[in-house]
Swiss-Prot record:
The record marks D542 as: Involved in J base recognition, conferring specificity towards J-DNA. Residues 1-24 are annotated as: Disordered. GO terms for molecular function: DNA binding; metal ion binding; thymine dioxygenase activity. This is Thymine dioxygenase JBP1-A. Residues 1-12 have a biased composition (Basic and acidic residues). It comes from Trypanosoma cruzi (strain CL Brener). Its cofactor is Fe(2+). The keyword Nucleus applies. Pfam families: DB_JBP1 (PF18526), Tet_JBP (PF12851). GO terms for cellular component: nucleus. The keyword Signal does not apply. The DNA-binding JBP1 domain (DB-JBP1) is necessary and sufficient for binding to J-DNA. Its main location: nucleus.
């Protein structure tokens, strides 16, 4: 009923004479609302995308070698921790409470479009920010979101407290350094964090988080969502973390990182994902911000501010050296053993896994013995061409106008020109108080007079001139901002609400601009588009962000004049408004010392919540200690490789005879690459068993599935393409469980993944063509490689299901493998 009634109102407004228009009607005219969806041309998409990805490319899951599924401590080649992955570490209630508050913080912003392929993502900041490099006049303060949501803001604190406690438990030294550096008045609830970045449905391209504290870490928490994929990837290291709601990743934000693709059955399928990054914005501890805190504090004491300041003095702390540059990277060659050494549930055998990792690097031929093929094949499955993949952004995308102005697309400009008379005095006088109307009339006349003077001066130099040149340092420019201040209070008064909606803001300011443009023509005698809607739109955006001249750069007397005038305008609006007085969400003008006024104590025990300290103990978190050294070459390590038993009647000749003809583009790609041809023409890998091998203390035994193993007690078991020979899923699952019990530590399940590595990025016609031939082609390759007549090939999701998702430590992808081979690390029991 409400929607229907709204439509009727709009219809009435379009036909009613101006004098009968109700107060809110002017700002809800349908033609003036911004376009919800705008179709960009192919050229616009291509230009925006190419410019963005030149500096910030997207990387897909296939571009990374390891996907971590379980708790992980990932280190670089020097042993320095790059990331700690903690699945499910955030309590559900804390995640939900924070999500309910922070969800609206993520708004369309062009400021991060370079990390989203040239398009405005849903992103925002909360807490405190320095606004260095921004046209906002007043620096080093609460974000607008925090200021406007001060009453609900404390619901974020449980999440902050848990995340801080987890950070402290895992990285006590870095936590202490960050805690010592962050100014007390810009802490979020006593934590070492000053700022939150909130992202919604935002697949980030590769970037570093410039401005974060160099001596600390950032913490990424997934608050809510329904999605697959979108792993957080450390691009220079070739690893990514499969995150889901309530997961936490503590990582070095100065490494290049990004999100992999969303894993959707169809590109237009819905998905949702709300994340929050907690960090210390280092500029908030620099002298310029400290001076701003001191200025505000002195002013608060001088006027006897109420409530009183939360602190008596500002302390300049040691903020360390923050270079705002990418951190140096020291990647290493990835192997299944090296990856498994990072998995927390295998920390008791880390030294042994690192020894096996070293052994593989020393003896690359062992890769074939252990896994059936090399970890990297240069002439195997070729990389997909760009033309075979869907765009990162679909052809129809949301194109939003930046905050503070209006959309210049569609019929909005024409509709605004037709209705500009709404700003005439006879239509406003009955709805606004006399004081505010007087300010509007005087400010409008003053600005038009200055515009006319500037125009006449320009025309004396060039009588043929048709366009007005806007001088940003002129009295006319200052008068325009004064006029905007009056208009802003008029909007609030007309709507009887402190926070107009985006549509109401848009409608008001486009009408405002149309009225001024019309007045320049009719009252100043200027050409119709001498000033123009576009130029007024640009200046309105300047006004929204504080003007082109920062308040702090103005002479003291001018600063005082502007602040006092803003105050008088607001008071005039309040005197003329019948609405009850509410909290003023006038963030841009807030120059009070309101730091920490929003802080509240969290009553954990009273609410039946575990305290952060108790929760950390419950999780069993321990500090990341020094890097574990590889086991000595003489330490006993036993690796058992299990091969599928060859079928009695199967021969290489039989396998070759069953190879399908490579007639389609996809079958040629799968079967005719040099590595695939070697498999088809070569000897099967399981025709004969090699003798046991020894490398110091490392012993490698190879046997067939089903052989007697009574006297064998391996540390690690590698199942080499065994599950492909088992038709029934339950039987395959039972076999994994059996070998997991045999292995002392973990099992490496090595199998063909019949799904294309870029499955979720393939154009539909390419995906269909691939799926038509993939299973037959891989069956032929598998039969040739393992001398089997029957095989059932599976996808990664089905293999993970067979191995029990909660027992998966990681997935390793063999790069360029002709069999599209992967290895899953399966931990049979949770080991302390």
């Amino acid at each position: 009923m409400k929607q229907k009634r709204g439509k009727q109102d709009v219809k009435m407004l379009e036909s009613a004479p101006p004098q009968l228009l109700p107060k809110k009607g002017r700002l809800e005219i349908s033609e003036l609302a911004p376009q919800q969806r705008t179709i960009r041309t192919a050229e616009e998409i291509e230009t925006a995308y190419n410019e963005a990805v030149r500096k910030h490319p997207f990387y897909d899951n296939a571009d990374h070698t390891i996907d971590f599924h379980d708790a992980t401590v990932f280190r670089d080649a020097r042993g320095v921790v790059g990331g700690v992955f903690l699945p499910g570490a955030l309590p559900a209630f804390a995640a939900t409470m924070a999500a309910d508050v922070l969800r609206p913080a993520a708004v369309r912003t062009s400021l991060r479009s370079n990390m989203f392929g040239g398009f405005a993502p849903l992103s925002g900041i909360a807490g405190y920010f320095d606004y260095r490099g921004s046209p906002v006049e007043l620096k080093c303060r609460k974000t607008s979101f925090t200021y406007e949501n001060v009453h609900s803001w404390p619901n974020v604190f449980p999440m902050i407290d848990y995340v801080s406690a987890i950070y402290k438990a895992v990285f006590p030294e870095q936590w202490a350094a960050q805690d010592a550096a962050v100014p007390d008045i810009v802490r979020i609830h006593g934590s070492p964090f000053s700022t939150l970045t909130v992202n919604q449905q935002f697949r980030t391209a590769s970037h570093t988080d410039a401005g974060d504290f160099d001596m600390g870490y950032g913490l990424l928490a997934v608050l809510e969502g329904k999605f697959e994929g979108l792993s957080l990837a450390l691009d220079d290291f070739g690893v990514c973390f499969r995150m889901q709601p309530r997961d936490i990743l503590i990582f070095n934000t100065h490494f290049f990182h990004s999100n992999t693709e969303p894993e959707l059955n169809h590109p237009r399928d819905d998905w949702s994902r709300l994340t929050c990054v907690c960090y210390y914005r280092a500029a908030l501890g620099e002298p310029a911000c400290v001076a701003e805190y001191e200025r505000r504090l002195a002013r608060a004491k001088e006027i006897g501010a109420s409530p009183p300041p939360a602190v008596d003095a500002i302390l300049q702390k040691d903020n360390g050296n923050n270079f705002n540059k990418p951190a140096p990277t020291f990647p290493y060659l990835l192997t299944p053993f090296g990856g498994a050494a990072s998995v927390c549930s295998l920390h008791c055998c880390t030294a042994k896994l690192l020894r096996l990792h070293e052994l593989l690097l020393e003896n690359p031929t062992l890769e074939v013995i252990l896994f059936g093929e090399s970890l990297r094949t240069d002439d195997g499955l070729p990389r997909r061409e760009k033309e075979q993949l869907i765009s990162v952004h679909l052809p129809v995308v949301v194109k939003m106008s930046p905050s503070g102005g209006f959309s210049e697309l569609g019929g909005a400009l024409k509709a605004a020109e037709e209705k500009q008379y709404f700003f005439e005095e006879k239509y406003l006088a009955d709805e606004l108080g006399p004081d505010l109307m007087s300010m509007w009339t005087q400010s409008r006349a003053h600005w038009l007079r200055l515009v006319k003077e500037d125009w006449e001066r320009l025309c004396r130099r060039d009588p043929e001139r048709t366009k007005f040149t806007w001088n940003n340092s002129s009295a006319m420019n200052a008068a325009f901002f004064d006029l905007c201040e009056v208009a802003k209070q008029m909007m609030i008064g007309l709507l009887n609400k402190e926070t107009p909606s985006s549509a109401e803001n848009h409608s008001f300011w486009i009408l405002f601009a149309a009225h001024l443009n019309y007045a320049c023509t009719t009252e100043n005698g200027m050409p119709r588009d001498a000033v123009g809607m576009h130029k007024l739109n640009v200046k309105l955006k300047d006004f929204h962000f504080g003007g082109t001249r920062y308040l702090k750069d103005m002479p003291p007397e001018e600063q005082e004049r502007r602040l006092e005038r803003k105050k008088r305008i607001e008071e005039a609006r309040r005197r003329g408004s019948s609405a009850h007085e509410t909290h003023t969400d006038n963030w841009l003008l807030n120059d009070t010392f309101d730091y920490q006024q929003e802080d509240r104590k969290v009553e954990f025990e009273e609410n039946g919540w575990m305290t952060p300290e108790a929760y950390v103990k419950h999780l069993g978190l321990k500090p990341c200690g020094d890097v574990t050294a590889a086991a000595s070459p003489t330490e006993p390590i036993h690796v058992l490789v299990v091969l599928p038993r060859p079928a009695a009647a199967a021969t290489a000749k039989d396998a070759k005879r069953d190879v399908p003809l490579a007639t389609s583009e996809e079958s040629i790609r799968l079967l005719m690459n040099p590595a695939a041809q070697r498999v088809l023409r070569g000897k099967a890998r399981n025709v004969a068993l090699p003798s046991p091998l020894s490398f110091g203390g490392v012993k490698i035994t190879v046997l067939f599935d089903g052989d007697d193993i009574d006297c064998i007690h391996p540390d690690f078991v590698i199942l080499q393409h065994l599950l492909a020979t088992i038709e029934e899923d339950e039987a395959a699952k039972a076999r994994v469980k059996y070998w997991a019990r045999v292995a002392r530590y973990c099992v490496f399940v090595v199998e063909t993944d019949v799904r294309d590595r870029r499955h979720f990025l393939l154009r539909e016609e390419v995906r269909v063509a691939y799926e038509d031939v993939a299973e037959d082609c891989f069956r032929s390759l598998h039969a040739a490689a393992y001398s089997t007549k029957y095989n059932r090939l599976r996808t990664t999701p089905s293999l993970i299901a067979l191995c029990n998702r909660k027992n998966i430590g990681l997935r390793f992808k063999f790069r360029g493998s002709p069999l599209n081979t992967i290895a899953l690390v399966v931990v049979g029991e949770r080991l302390d």
